[in-house]
């Protein structure tokens, strides 16, 4: 069984169809690449898989659980995240403030604290640097953030 499946997804921006029935699967331990020209839909596919966009059709099972109706922040808690190219951090804010920006719409303070601890467990360097300005982090540290 595949760890991740993308089954015949169709994604639109308004009336414009951006993705026309893309399918692929990723087995555990497998690495794949999305290759295509500028504007071919690579980023749209990744945004859809990570919950930033919702397909009009198709399914995206991840470890047996359908992702299409799950909000992006919950997909992250399942262990999948989209790390965009570039280092889009708030340079004048601390690491901790940057992380908290990702939770600004969430109300459950206990859940936010647990999520923050999970991030720090996965990225101990960020915990060490939580009070440091994000703009002063190395490139790799900014990608972690």
Predicted regions and their residues:
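ABC-type ATPase nucleotide-binding domains, specifically the catalytic core motifs of the NBD
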Residues: 14, 70, 95-114, 122-127
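Conserved ABC transporter NBD signature motif
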Residues: 58-66, 78, 112-116
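Helix-to-loop junction immediately C-terminal to a conserved catalytic motif
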Residues: 50
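Conserved ABC ATPase signature
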Residues: 133-137, 141
């Amino acid at each position: 069984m595949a760890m991740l499946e993308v089954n015949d997804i169709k994604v639109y921006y308004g009336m414009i169809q951006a993705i026309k029935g893309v399918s692929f699967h990723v087995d555990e331990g497998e690495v794949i690449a999305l290759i295509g020209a500028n504007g071919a839909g690579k980023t749209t596919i990744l945004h859809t898989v990570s919950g930033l966009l919702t397909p009009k059709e198709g399914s995206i099972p991840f470890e047996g659980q359908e992702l299409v109706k799950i909000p992006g922040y919950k997909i992250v808690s399942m262990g999948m995240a989209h790390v965009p190219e570039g280092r889009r951090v708030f340079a004048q804010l601390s690491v901790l403030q940057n992380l908290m920006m990702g939770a600004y719409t969430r109300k459950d303070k206990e859940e936010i604290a647990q999520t923050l601890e999970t991030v720090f467990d996965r990225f101990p360097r960020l915990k060490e640097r939580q009070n440091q300005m994000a703009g002063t982090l190395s490139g790799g540290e900014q990608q972690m953030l």
